[in-house]
Curated annotation (Swiss-Prot):
It comes from Arabidopsis thaliana. SUPFAM superfamilies: DNA-binding domain. It is found in: Nucleus. It holds the Pfam family AP2. Belongs to the AP2/ERF transcription factor family. ERF subfamily. This is Ethylene-responsive transcription factor ERF088. GO terms for molecular function: DNA binding; DNA-binding transcription factor activity. Probably acts as a transcriptional activator. Binds to the GCC-box pathogenesis-related promoter element. May be involved in the regulation of gene expression by stress factors and by components of stress signal transduction pathways. Residues 20-77 bind DNA. GO terms for cellular component: nucleus. PANTHER family: AP2 DOMAIN CLASS TRANSCRIPTION FACTOR, ETHYLENE-RESPONSIVE TRANSCRIPTION FACTOR ERF088. Keywords: Activator, DNA-binding, Ethylene signaling pathway, Nucleus, Transcription, Transcription regulation.
Length: 219
């Protein structure tokens, strides 16, 4: 008699506990399932199964607040400053994943946390590499054509020539020597600039080396 009465009491308590929370149903094997109905689209969203009724009720509250905001009807009382950061542990059905539309309602994280953040080291290296490429591919020099003295003019160089003149662009970005390659500022009214002399001297020495290495033919 005592065992039967205890079983009845336990069943009644479970029924009361099951009907106590919104969107919570007790499974025959003892776990609790949570689901919610969207009042705007009239669709039902499956939230998962939980060990306790309180966890299932909390999952329902998170989904309800994500749909209707502070006007949602919830199982527990929440203030406006309450943050629903704690997600209850739940077991997913075999056909469900965290990316499904129903489980997305449980995610109450800030919008920026759902995106990948660029690696600051790789991004800074790419910026240095891009800046060094732009610096090595163009340079400015001064010229004198009579009326226009000290005017600036940009000349584009091939990649192979610019790399040989100013050093490889990866090394420039690695050792932070880009400041030594800032050409293009006009020096007052002087007809010649250091950059132009440097390029001319380099080309002359290069042509001299080529001529010296060329085979000599006897006439």
């Amino acid at each position: 008699m005592l065992k039967s009465s205890n079983k009845r009491k336990s069943k009644e308590e479970k029924k009361l506990q099951e009907g106590k929370y919104l969107g919570v149903r007790r499974r025959p094997w003892g776990r609790y399932a949570a689901e919610i109905r969207n009042p705007f689209t009239k669709e039902r969203h499956w939230l998962g199964t939980f060990d306790t009724a309180e966890e299932a009720a909390f999952a329902y509250d998170v989904a309800a607040r994500s749909i209707s905001g502070s006007l949602a009807t919830t199982n527990f009382f929440y203030t406006e400053n309450t943050s629903l950061e704690r997600h209850p542990q739940q077991s997913l059905e075999p056909h469900m994943t965290w990316g499904s539309s129903s489980l997305c309602l449980l995610q109450d994280q800030p919008f920026e946390n759902n995106h990948f953040v660029a690696d600051p080291i790789s991004s800074s290296f790419s910026q240095k590499q891009e800046s060094s490429t732009n610096l090595t591919n163009t340079f400015s020099h001064c010229y004198n054509d009579g009326d226009h003295v000290g005017q600036s003019k940009e000349i584009s160089l091939p990649n192979d020539m610019s790399n040989s003149l100013f050093g490889h662009q990866d090394k420039v970005g690695e050792h932070d020597n880009a400041d030594h390659m800032k050409f293009g500022s006009v020096l007052s009214d002087e007809p010649l600039c250091f950059e132009y002399d440097y390029i001319g001297n380099y080309l002359q020495s290069f042509l001299k080396d080529v001529n010296d290495d060329a085979p000599q033919f006897l006439m």
